[in-house]
Amino acid sequence: MSMRTLFQTLSVLALSALPALAQETTAEPAEDLSMGTTAAAAPLTQETAQVGQGYLATNHDLWEQRCEKTEDGKDPCQLFQLLKDAEGNAVAEFSIFALPAGGPAAAGATVVAPLETLLTEALTIAIDTAPAKIYPFTFCTVEGCVARVGFTAEEVEQFKKGAKATVTLVPAAAPEKQVNLDISLKGFTAGYEAIAATVPAQ
């Protein structure tokens, strides 16, 4: 048999197998196919945000400087950091903002913890090796449970000079355990000074 004849024979066999292959392919539902997900839109910027929308102004290492667009251009800002556990899983959110001078708190913060957190144990925040302070949870939404925190001017200075802070939560499913989440303070000083400049003078 010549090479050409052999090639023609193999081609016929291959074509004759296609209907059977199609039947096998369509007979069983495909369970390993990805249907895709919608790609995340690019973060809003000061130029693309509309009045009332939040946008990402810049980054200070792991801190995001998030602001809200206003009509007069005096956009209030805060610092945001996503907190992860030892395995790198996103667990909680930490946001801090400067307050007008003269009050007991120089800065305010919100911590959003998972709904599975044991609320009666509250949460603690420690800056480096300083003693931890306890803060209660204020309310819960479908996105998580929120603690509203106030920091004194002295504590803000500790944030600026420190290496890390630690948020500690207690899981409701394992009340005997604690989950420690590090807050990197690298870039905090520059970021805090930037958001403090957006606070209206009293």
Provide a role label for each language-model segment.
Residues Q23-Q202:
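A generic "folded-domain core" signal
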